[in-house]
Amino acid sequence: MAVGALIRLAFHKHAVDRSRALQKHVPANVTAVRDLHYGGADAFLDVFYPSEHQNDERLLPAIVWIHGGAFVGGDKSDVASYLEILAGRGYTAIGINYSLAPGARYPAPVIQANQALSFLNAYADRLHVDPRRLFLAGDSAGAQIASQLAAAVVDPSYAESLGISPAVEPAQIEGVALFCGVYDVSQIDRRGSFGRVLETVVWSYFGRRDVTADPRLAEFSVIRHVTQEFPPAFISAGNADPLAPQSVAVADAIRAHGVAVTEVFFPPDYTRALPHEYQFDLDGANGRRTLERLTTWLDERARAGGSEGAPHR
């Protein structure tokens, strides 16, 4: 079996276990609309919103979440339970699928995520989406994709380099929530087993084994494209996540441009080692606290961005 397939299988097993563990935390008062087709063959999205609005036309601040999976795996179903939990707190939460590597190459997922925003703009009234109050979010590879899309929305030259005509205006993006992503490949330690996995992932996504001289790698590394127009950010990673330095670095870069950053990080000697994607562990106190921090941040941003204020709970 190819290494990429092994990575995909490992992510799938972990995601299934994680989703099963999250089920007990999912509220009953959430309505789901699944598998809406927003574009090409792999372009489907799920929408979750509070059931109390099933028969009304209330528009809610919307969280557009892009799943992880190292660009070669993952599915919107992996984050569905977490999105249902967020929807139960007064939001419309959307999980999107995108085409995976090696079948789809960079920057196809970023382009598809932009298409999803176009779809949500067009059908906002039917899906309880307030298009004036959108949040981009993602975990792992999805965080990287979300960060690139956020940068493209606010920077026309960056959007042009990606081949994107942004589907939304900068003012529509209230913020971006990024968990355990990659934001500057040049700063990742490629030694050991993790380095070998990274090389396989990059090879699959970019279509060439050695991408060190590929100008697209600098484009991919969104930390180099942050400007003062970048949306306010919520950023977190676990202390035992090998990608945690990436989150710290991008938080510093965003803040250096005068943009508000809310971060949840943990010291290296923290009493518990928190792994990649720790935020989905709601059986643990740290995952629960981060969910509360995220919800508070979302509420504050939603209140600042819309006349209807924060969601009612």
Q: Whereabouts are the PLM-identified features?
A:
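Alpha/beta-hydrolase superfamily serine-hydrolase fold, recognizing
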Residues: 1-313
